[in-house]
Each structure stands twice: as C-alpha cells, then as structure tokens.
C-alpha cells in the first residue's frame, strides 16, 4: 500500500532538478507534470531518463506543444481538482503559470475544499517591461494562493508587490539541485581546469555572439596562454554561432551540442570557469551545478542567481552583459592568476547549502507547516 503523501508539486514537465526537489521531501510528496517534455528543454529532457516512482504525467507520451490547448486545460483542471494532497505547490516557469485559467479555477475549487495552495515564483520587476493593467490583473489571479516559494530577494519583493505582503513568502529555495547528483558521477574532478565553459540554450537571450567576440579578443590578447572554449547546448542559433566562430578564426572553440547531466558534470569538472553572459536569465541553474563541482563563474549582472549564490571576488565575477573589456579582463585574470582562481574555487563552498535542495526542503517546511 502506497504511503499517503501530503504534498503535491506541479510543473509543466520534469527536469533533473524537479526530481531533486521531489526526493528532498523524503517520500512525503508526489509530483504531477502536464507533459513528458516541453520547449525549450526538449533536447535536454530527451538526452536522459527523468523518472521517479512518485512522478505522474498527465500526457506521458506527448510534448507540451503537441497538446491542443482546450484538451490540455480540461485535463489539467480535472487532474488538479481530484487531488487528495493537503498542500499543493504550483510551479512557475516553462509553460506553466499560476494565473493560467485552468490552474486558477482549479485553485479556487481546491481552496473551497480547504487545500493549502502555494506557488513557486522566480520572476521579478526587471525581466521584462511591465504594464500597470497587467500587474493589477495578476494581483487578482494570484488571490487563491496562500504563500510563495521564491528564487531570491527580487522575486520575493515582486510577489509581495502583487499582493503577498501578508502571506508566507520565502526568498530562497526555488532554484536548487541535489549536489550529490554531480558528485556521484564515475569520474574524478580534473585538477588542471584547462578551458572555459558555457552551458545553455543557443539563442539570442544567452548573448553568445557577444561572448564569441569577447573570446576572440581574449585569444588575441593572451596568445598561446589563452584557454580553449567549450559550449554545451542546442537551439535555433547553433549553426549561426558555429559559422561566426569560423569567421572569427576561432580554432579552439568546441560546440558539444546537447549533453546529459553526467556529461555536463564531466565537462564542468575540467572547466577553469563557467561563463554566463546572458542579456537576461531568470536564474541560471547551471550556476548551482558549478558550485557542486567548485567551479568559479563569470556571470552577467542580469543572471538572477547572482543575487543569492554568486558574490563578487568570492566565487566569481559579475560583469555587465555588454562590457566587452570587463569580460576580457575577467577571463584574463582567471587564466593567469592561479592564486586568485584558487580563492574563487574555495569560495564556492560558502554557497553549497543555499544552492542545494536542503534549501528547497527548508522553504517547503516553512510554508506547509506554518500556513493554515
């Protein structure tokens, strides 16, 4: 007989860190997803097996984008209102929003049955232009929810602005991973740390054109001392970025395509630093993965992970996404100054707890236990 679970986690589809969160709750939770995969994560999701005994999928054989909207809304609504769990935590991100009509009306009905409906929230004031009318509408559609588990301080401030000032809110816990998932791989951490690494989707938001031009200038400046550059990921602009690397005559750039988490961990373990120059990044979960393997980071100031788990000159460098000289200098220092690099490596230890699923469990315990 299956143990009764008191918590339900809801998301559009499952990623490896979704399973990390589920496992962190020690058998007290189920996870419900809408589809087996979704854009823009399909390549990553298809590159590895993502499963768990407590994971349920409404459309187990379909991508989110293959499901007609009317059918999806009906099935999601019915799946939610039939749930027995006392605490239901609605994810935010990908293709799911707590103010989508199927989610919203299900939340209202669940509240009538005295369910404790919470949300996970990782957006903030700065991720896009805001409209007063839309913001007012959001405050209405967020009324059924009794609390929020947020990614960081800016997300917590934003949700409070949207009507959660008197509700339970955490400013930690959303974007977390199980660090042991990276430590358990069958390889030793490479002590040489002899290349730079980018991990992410190949699209304009990630600012790869800028990064390749920065890398070209870095190579011109350092000559034979310049480190190779590896890029992991797929996406609509991949071929254009490969062509740009050829046009810039970058012989030490390697595009690895989509990789499994085990392969990413192996690449991270040998990286001198992880580079994330994104024009905007809601979080950047790969920063957590870098912390797992004690890898310093150079991140754009618009990567929201830097609010909580990156500190300037402690475990990384924070640079404007259009500051070419700043990026070149940062890469140069990390390349040639072994003492500084060692200091950054040691600094990653400070952020292991906050970036790990222990932080997620702590946030859930706070919201579930203390919310009536």
Could you tell me what each predicted segment is?
Residues 296-300, 310:
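Short hydrophobic beta-strand element within catalytic cores of glycosyltransferases
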Residues 312-313, 317-324, 331-338:
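Conserved acidic donor-binding segment of nucleotide-sugar-dependent glycosyltransferases
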Residues 143-184, 190-191:
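Donor nucleotide-sugar binding/catalytic pocket of nucleotide-sugar-dependent glycosyltransferases
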Residues 239-259:
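Nucleotide-activated donor-binding/catalytic signature segment of Leloir-type glycosyltransferases, i.e.
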């Amino acid at each position: 007989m299956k143990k009764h679970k008191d918590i339900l986690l809801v998301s559009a589809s499952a990623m490896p860190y979704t399973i990390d969160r589920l496992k962190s709750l020690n058998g007290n939770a189920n996870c419900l997803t809408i589809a087996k995969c979704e854009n823009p994560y399909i390549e990553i999701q298809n590159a590895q097996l993502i499963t768990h005994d407590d994971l349920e999928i409404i459309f187990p054989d379909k991508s989110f984008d293959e499901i007609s909207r009317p059918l999806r809304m009906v099935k999601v609504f019915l799946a939610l209102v039939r749930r027995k769990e006392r605490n239901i935590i609605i994810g935010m991100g990908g293709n799911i929003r707590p103010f989508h009509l199927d989610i919203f009306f299900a939340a209202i009905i669940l509240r009538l049955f005295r369910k404790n409906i919470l949300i996970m929230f990782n957006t903030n004031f700065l991720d896009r232009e805001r409209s007063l009318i839309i913001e007012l509408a959001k405050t209405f559609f967020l009324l059924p929810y009794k609390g929020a588990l947020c990614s960081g301080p800016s997300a917590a401030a934003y949700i409070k602005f949207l009507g959660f000032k008197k509700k339970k809110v955490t400013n930690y816990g959303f974007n977390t991973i199980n660090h042991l998932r990276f430590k358990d791989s069958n390889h030793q951490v490479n002590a040489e740390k002899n290349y730079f690494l980018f991990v992410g989707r190949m699209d304009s938001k990630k600012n790869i054109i800028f990064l390749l031009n920065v890398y070209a200038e870095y190579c011109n400046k350092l000559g034979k001392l310049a480190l190779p550059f590896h890029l992991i990921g797929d996406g609509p602009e991949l071929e254009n970025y490969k062509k740009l690397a050829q046009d810039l005559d970058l012989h030490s750039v390697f595009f690895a395509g989509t990789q499994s988490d085990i392969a990413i961990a192996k690449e991270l373990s040998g990286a001198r630093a992880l580079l994330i120059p994104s024009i905007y990044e809601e979080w950047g979960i790969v920063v957590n993965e870098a912390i797992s393997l004690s890898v310093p980071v150079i991140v754009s100031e618009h990567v929201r992970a830097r609010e909580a788990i990156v500190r300037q000159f402690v475990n990384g460098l924070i640079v404007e996404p259009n500051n070419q000289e700043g990026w070149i200098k940062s890469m140069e220092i990390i390349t040639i100054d072994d003492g500084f690099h060692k200091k950054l490596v040691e600094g990653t230890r400070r952020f292991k707890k906050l970036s790990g699923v222990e932080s997620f469990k702590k946030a859930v315990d706070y919201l579930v236990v203390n919310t009536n």
